[in-house]
């Protein structure tokens, strides 16, 4: 009975999105409906996470067809901490846009497609079937393309074309990898794939397939292949930019973690050094980006790229500490990047400018944003006791254990550069007053300050309550780095199947 609840975090947003299509003339009911739906989804996800922590992973086989023949959802520590965090930030993002007045012609479509996007995101985290993961990625791609183009501006259409072309290439490679892997092992279920690959040992065909998946997921995660990201994020309104920054690249990073710990770990002689190299390139180019631009929305976009480099560096160390740190930082970064883009969007709204030199001492008149920005900088920089600290320490530890001193040095340097670029913005927030000029700032709605306050509190709480979250990420790391334990806890009925 409990396993049936596993479908609800995906089913509820899907049903709500369909209902909203017929409620476009009743704005108030629609708003309370989608906020209520995502709140309930978050609560259910949290309840499932607590159960899994106290007992064991949950599986749901659809239509009575057991894995590996049927579609299966898996609720383990990794998938459910991701679903819970994603549901939480989606709720806040939709609440942030509650009173938005621009794009009136499209405002009725916006919540529906955000919910469809959340279906793809949550489904990607829950599925333990490779083809179903592909389907969820395509749902995300379709919904995200619509969201990028809703404003119908030339800039949005240009960004959408770049975004879609690169993601379609990634999808083609993903589908090619699925076909080759199925031909090789004869199954698409994660647990069954792990069993078959273990029996095969090192194999050139499997190595080639793993490289195809690496490129496909790198396009989704903006790992090296990030050309679409800065342009796409820069043209989005605040809540959509926060949504994309918090979740889109994180789904790709999640897939990389799941694949290259559980499925293709035996081929780490090639894959993991390649992951470290790609992470290093991503961190360096991200650091160049945050220094090169004065546009605060583009600076925020390159901050996302740097954080992806951190996460994949942890995965590439192929150590328990590094992978644990990657998972912790991945979860934390969903919250922190939501906060970053909310603050950046608020600064643009208040001042009317995207260049930091026009912030005109805003923090003196709006001290709330100054304090929130400082806390966010410390969280991104990994300063104790803020939320970025535990994940970065574990990634540092993993890099040391692996002997990857270049990756470790690059992580330290790019972390400092990332903080410097944000402190540069903060400087103008406090000391950018223009003598003799009267500056007029727009007032931001109080409820949006309330949402920002919630995120600030959560960022602080993650740092303080790190031992609780580390227990979850420890369990997730142990399960995904021990394929025999994974098979025993998740799909013990597969033993002996051909």
Curated annotation (Swiss-Prot):
Q: Which family does it belong to?
A: Belongs to the CPA3 antiporters (TC 2.A.63) subunit D family.
Please report a single Pfam family linked to this protein.
Proton_antipo_M
Where are the disulfide bridges? Answer: none
Give the membrane topology, semicolon-separated if more than one: Multi-pass membrane protein
> Which BP terms in the Gene Ontology apply to this protein?
ATP synthesis coupled electron transport
Regions that span the bilayer: 2-22, 32-52, 78-98, 108-128, 130-150, 161-181, 209-229, 240-260, 271-291, 308-328, 330-350, 368-388, 403-423, 450-470
Keyword list, A-Z: Antiport, Cell membrane, Ion transport, Membrane, Transmembrane, Transmembrane helix, Transport
Q: Name its cellular compartments.
A: Cell membrane
| Annotated source species | Staphylococcus aureus (strain MRSA252)
> What is a single cellular component term in the Gene Ontology annotation?
plasma membrane
Taxonomy of origin reads: Bacteria, Bacillati, Bacillota, Bacilli, Bacillales
UniProt GO molecular function: antiporter activity; NADH dehydrogenase (ubiquinone) activity
**Quaternary form?**
May form a heterooligomeric complex that consists of seven subunits: mnhA2, mnhB2, mnhC2, mnhD2, mnhE2, mnhF2 and mnhG2.
Report if keyword Iron-sulfur is assigned.
Answer: no
Q: What is this protein called?
A: Putative antiporter subunit mnhD2
Q: Which PANTHER family match?
A: NA(+)_H(+) ANTIPORTER SUBUNIT D1, NADH DEHYDROGENASE
This protein's record includes keyword Nucleotidyltransferase: no
């Amino acid at each position: 009975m409990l396993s049936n609840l596993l479908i609800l975090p995906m089913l509820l947003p899907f049903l709500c999105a369909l209902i909203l299509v017929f409620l476009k003339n009743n704005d108030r009911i629609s708003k309370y409906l989608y906020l209520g739906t995502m709140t309930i989804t978050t609560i259910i996800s949290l309840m499932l996470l607590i159960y899994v922590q106290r007992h064991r992973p949950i599986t749901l086989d659809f239509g009575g067809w057991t894995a590996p023949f049927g579609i299966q959802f898996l609720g383990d520590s990794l998938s459910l901490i991701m679903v819970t965090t994603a549901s939480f930030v989606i709720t806040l993002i939709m609440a942030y846009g509650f009173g938005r007045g621009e794009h009136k012609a499209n405002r009725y479509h916006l919540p529906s497609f955000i919910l469809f996007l959340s279906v793809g995101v949550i489904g990607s985290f829950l599925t333990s079937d490779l083809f179903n993961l592909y389907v969820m990625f395509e749902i995300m791609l379709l919904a995200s393309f619509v969201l990028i183009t809703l404003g119908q501006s030339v800039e949005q259409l240009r960004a959408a074309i770049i975004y879609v072309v690169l993601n379609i290439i990634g999808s083609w490679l993903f589908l090619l990898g699925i076909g080759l892997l199925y031909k090789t092992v004869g199954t698409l279920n994660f647990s069954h794939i792990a069993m078959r690959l273990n029996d095969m040992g090192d194999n050139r065909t499997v190595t080639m397939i793993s490289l195809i998946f690496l490129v496909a997921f790198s396009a989704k995660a903006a790992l090296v292949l990030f050309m679409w990201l800065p342009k796409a994020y820069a043209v989005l309104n605040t809540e959509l930019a926060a949504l994309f920054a918090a979740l889109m690249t994180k789904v790709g990073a999640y897939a990389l973690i799941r694949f290259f710990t559980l499925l293709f770990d035996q081929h780490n002689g090639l894959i993991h050094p390649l992951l470290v190299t790609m992470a290093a390139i991503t961190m360096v180019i991200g650091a160049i980006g945050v220094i090169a631009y004065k546009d605060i929305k583009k600076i925020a976009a390159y901050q996302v790229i740097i954080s992806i480099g951190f996460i994949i560096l942890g995965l590439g160390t192929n150590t328990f500490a590094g992978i644990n740190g990657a998972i912790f930082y991945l979860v934390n970064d969903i919250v922190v990047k939501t906060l970053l883009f909310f603050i950046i969007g608020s600064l643009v709204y208040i001042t009317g400018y995207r260049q930091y030199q026009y912030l005109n001492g805003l923090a003196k008149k709006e001290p709330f944003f100054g304090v929130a920005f400082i806390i966010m900088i410390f969280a991104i920089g990994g300063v104790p006791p803020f939320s970025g600290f535990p994940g970065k320490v574990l990634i540092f530890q993993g890099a040391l254990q692996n002997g990857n001193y270049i990756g470790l040095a690059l992580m330290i340097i790019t972390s400092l550069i990332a903080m410097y670029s944000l402190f540069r913005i903060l400087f103008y927030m406090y000391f950018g007053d223009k003598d003799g000029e009267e500056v007029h700032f727009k007032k931001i709605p109080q409820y949006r300050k309330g949402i920002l306050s919630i995120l600030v509190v959560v960022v602080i709480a993650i740092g303080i309550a790190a031992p609780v979250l580390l227990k979850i990420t420890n369990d997730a790391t142990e399960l995904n780095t021990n394929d025999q334990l994974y098979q025993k806890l998740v799909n013990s009925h597969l033993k002996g199947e051909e």
